């Protein structure tokens, strides 16, 4: 991902304030509600029948936290996202057969959740930087598909 020094600094500074558990659970939950076809990968999570059930589901929250913990690792290695996410890309491609488009969707949902949580602090410039990051992460996760 090609970020300016200012963008890297702003992305890192905001991320330090992120509650990974809360934001991760909300982002994954919203993905499953807004794009219901993504639920097929999470059938073992139990009740996903309503938006309320999804957003309160402890397995969704736990996996969302796990997803954002991986995203945090990516932020520490912005110059080598493909290397950082190689194992996860392989898992999602070869074993889980996740549509790589879902990574892009989740990235966009994450940006929305960050905007919701940080309000005015999530400036258009910061959003632009985060869009670059989530696009880079989605690309790295889709790498094994190519």
From Swiss-Prot:
SUPFAM superfamilies: Globin-like
Modified residues (Phosphothreonine): 12
GO molecular function: haptoglobin binding; heme binding; hemoglobin alpha binding; metal ion binding; organic acid binding; oxygen binding; oxygen carrier activity; peroxidase activity
Alphabetized PROSITE patterns for the sequence: GLOBIN (PS01033)
Positions of post-translational S-nitrosocysteine modification: 93
Modification sites for N6-acetyllysine: 59, 82, 144
Similarity remark: Belongs to the globin family.
Protein name: Hemoglobin subunit beta
Every Globin domain range: 2-146
Role this protein plays: Involved in oxygen transport from the lung to the various peripheral tissues.
Signal peptide: none
Any one GO biological process: hydrogen peroxide catabolic process
Oligomeric and partner information: Heterotetramer of two alpha chains and two beta chains.
Keyword Ribosomal protein: no
Cellular component terms per the entry's GO annotation: blood microparticle; haptoglobin-hemoglobin complex; hemoglobin complex
Modification N-acetylvaline, positions: 1
Nucleus recorded as keyword: no
Keywords: Acetylation, Heme, Iron, Metal-binding, Oxygen transport, Phosphoprotein, S-nitrosylation, Transport
UniProt-annotated binding residues for heme b: 63, 92
Tissue expression pattern: Red blood cells.
